[in-house]
């Protein structure tokens, strides 16, 4: 049987460039990705470089609260 909390949790990554710039008529939304992280290996907030279809380039996507 498993003991304690699960180490792996689901997190949502959101484009930091879209959030800072605000949603305008040019960008129709904010890019979000769903992924998993291991709490023991990465206790802090996760930041990954992913492609944003609204910015048309690779930007930093940061973890957000659910």
UniProtKB/Swiss-Prot annotation:
<dbReference type="GO" id="GO:0006412">
    <property type="term" value="P:translation"/>
</dbReference>
<keyword id="KW-0934">Plastid</keyword>
<dbReference type="GO" id="GO:0009507">
    <property type="term" value="C:chloroplast"/>
</dbReference>
<dbReference type="GO" id="GO:0003735">
    <property type="term" value="F:structural constituent of ribosome"/>
</dbReference>
<protein>
    <recommendedName>
        <fullName>Large ribosomal subunit protein bL33c</fullName>
    </recommendedName>
</protein>
<keyword id="KW-0687">Ribonucleoprotein</keyword>
<dbReference type="InterPro" id="IPR038584">
    <property type="entry name" value="Ribosomal_bL33_sf"/>
</dbReference>
<keyword id="KW-0689">Ribosomal protein</keyword>
<dbReference type="GO" id="GO:1990904">
    <property type="term" value="C:ribonucleoprotein complex"/>
</dbReference>
<dbReference type="Pfam" id="PF00471">
    <property type="entry name" value="Ribosomal_L33"/>
</dbReference>
<keyword id="KW-0150">Chloroplast</keyword>
<dbReference type="InterPro" id="IPR018264">
    <property type="entry name" value="Ribosomal_bL33_CS"/>
</dbReference>
<dbReference type="InterPro" id="IPR011332">
    <property type="entry name" value="Ribosomal_zn-bd"/>
</dbReference>
<dbReference type="GO" id="GO:0005840">
    <property type="term" value="C:ribosome"/>
</dbReference>
<comment type="similarity">
    <text>Belongs to the bacterial ribosomal protein bL33 family.</text>
</comment>
<dbReference type="InterPro" id="IPR001705">
    <property type="entry name" value="Ribosomal_bL33"/>
</dbReference>
